Swiss-Prot record:
It comes from the Eukaryota. This is Protein FAM200A. GO terms for cellular component: membrane. It is found in: Membrane. It is a single-pass membrane protein. Belongs to the FAM200 family. Its main location: membrane. The chain crosses the membrane at residues 514-533. Residues 534-573 are cytoplasmic. The keyword Transmembrane helix applies.
Amino acid sequence: MTPESRDTTDLSPGGTQEMEGIVIVKVEEEDEEDHFQKERNKVESSPQVLSRSTTMNERALLSSYLVAYRVAKEKMAHTAAEKIILPACMDMVRTIFDDKSADKLRTIPLSDNTISRRICTIAKHLEAMLITRLQSGIDFAIQLDESTDIASCPTLLVYVRYVWQDDFVEDLLCCLNLNSHITGLDLFTELENCLLGQYKLNWKHCKGISSDGTANMTGKHSRLTEKLLEATHNNAVWNHCFIHREALVSKEISPSLMDVLKNAVKTVNFIKGSSLNSRLLEIFCSEIGVNHTHLLFHTEVRWLSQGKVLSRVYELRNEIYIFLVEKQSHLANIFEDDIWVTKLAYLSDIFGILNELSLKMQGKNNDIFQYLEHILGFQKTLLLWQARLKSNRPSYYMFPTLLQHIEENIINEDCLKEIKLEILLHLTSLSQTFNYYFPEEKFESLKENIWMKDPFAFQNPESIIELNLEPEEENELLQLSSSFTLKNYYKILSLSAFWIKIKDDFPLLSRKSILLLLPFTTTYLCELGFSILTRLKTKKRNRLNSAPDMRVALSSCVPDWKELMNRQAHPSH
């Protein structure tokens, strides 16, 4: 082809161009767009792309559930996911990786309404898991307590303990929002509607009920616990909360010591009740260089907190006295009274000791034998202290603050005798009150079943005969106490887990032990739940329906994320 022929090549639309043996076909502009659009549709509709897109959506949905789960577990506001968690995650991913990776996090639905729905879904899922377990016919025990939230709405918390797999499991059974004016009968009706009506549980499987001794629970007009026991056909046992009983014991105090307590509280209120006084005392204590510069408030509902309050008042007694003199307060006069200050030292010690006893009875998965040991041990300790004070050479070693005060100050002998008599009367009163709230006859059944605490302590047939067991039970205990393998399990397992583990080999002893260990002995979990409620339902969130958040925050069950993912991601419209 000559150059001239190349110059005259047809370049019209739809024509062809021939260049050195290559034929180029000109495609119209409209056809070209259709061609690429078809190719694009093929790519987008390919299984690989669809799978990738579906996977990303599933990951975003799962991430949304996981974030909502953490928000509820940490008792955070629902807006925290979108306002705090997401921006923080994007900052971290952008810093460590790149902007493109960070932008992918925006596909995760984290609005406050979405988080709220996710928490409700998780709560219903956890509730269904728990109820399915309880509906299988296993034995369970409950503890219940009532309180009011920040919006003055009564709330009833019910916890359950049941046998699952290889140990006891404790979980929140229900959180019921009640009407403003409610009686014990109303509480029973609400509880029965929930457990029997909604959950379809059977009262015959309830083996224990624990509550405090308030009028709404045990009063002669309401008698909630009595109605619950009737519903179980008296197959369950009722335990008055050990912690509540110990708090009632600690309130037994003579008028003289009560005056010391009231004046100490008045002093704290005078200083802490005024922001100016509180700041001035803080500045004064800082200038002197003392260890603490603040006083502590006391609340009546936390009666035993007075131990820390009194200890702080005693520690800062000299600084408080100087401050009160400068303020020309009449309360300064009480700090000039040696007897008053000495009694203050004693009260700070005894309330601290009672507080330690209360802490020993708090916690999860404690068995009744541990509580029995703490109570009986403290009762004997009180008797020992009384004997020490009655001796010719009285000793105050058990009250370190009081002992240090006596050693560092010159106290009149007559004053010291008066104080010793006051302390002795208080310890005697404590012993009597302990015997009233923890009567020895109530513990007789526990003492008869002490073999449950350590079955390997009964190696001899003679010791087993004294336990008043049935012949079949005696034979099981003899075989059990002779097993070296099971003794090793006993050392490493909890008491409840041990008896559950051997339920097939020793059914009689195991069943008897489980029924005794299963009931709660305190309402500690309810008190813990109400503390969580105060964190969830604040003044800014006083309209929150706290039940779903409480369920997720306190549940012992672990969500099945695959099952949740199979549910509808968006609510029906």
